[in-house]
Amino acid sequence: MILSIMQPYLFPYIGYWQLIANSDKFIFFDVVQYNKKSWMNRNKILHPDKSKEFQYISFPVKNNLQGTLISAVTLNNEEKWKEKILGQLTVYKSLKAPYYNETIDLIQNIFIQDYQTLLSFSIESTKKICQYLDIELKYEIASEIDFDRKIIEGPGDWALSISKEFNTSEYINLYGGYKIFDETKY
């Protein structure tokens, strides 16, 4: 079995989808600390002012205190973040971006549901985008897996422990992550 593991992201980059497409099982990695400056609840899009390179889209979170696990991060639904994101994305309509209407339809389909947590949004949006892209998604959530946390001494050990739990024959990761892994342990 080929396994891959990633933290949840807001509309992730292409490498995320490549991992899912090339895995037999994908793990939503939610058992580490949330980082408010990460891509978990924000992303970059083009800015309507051509003199500016980009703008952020994001959804607000309620509890982003230092030490909060990703699995515990809740969304602040009192703010109208869905409407704001859809409004920000109109920059692509003005640029006559191909597939704009299809993409907005997909995002609106994702936004129909109410989400209480960052993780629930990430899972549901990933499922719907995979369906749109015709990518099979078989997933687990790290916080729901009974894997050996005692062997974890560094960042690369999480994947090793989860891989052992599933008797994985191969673990794949994006290129940028190779620095945290000790090949001799795999």
Sequence positions of predicted segments:
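Residues lining hydrophobic/aromatic ligand-binding pockets adjacent to catalytic sites
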Residues: 1-186
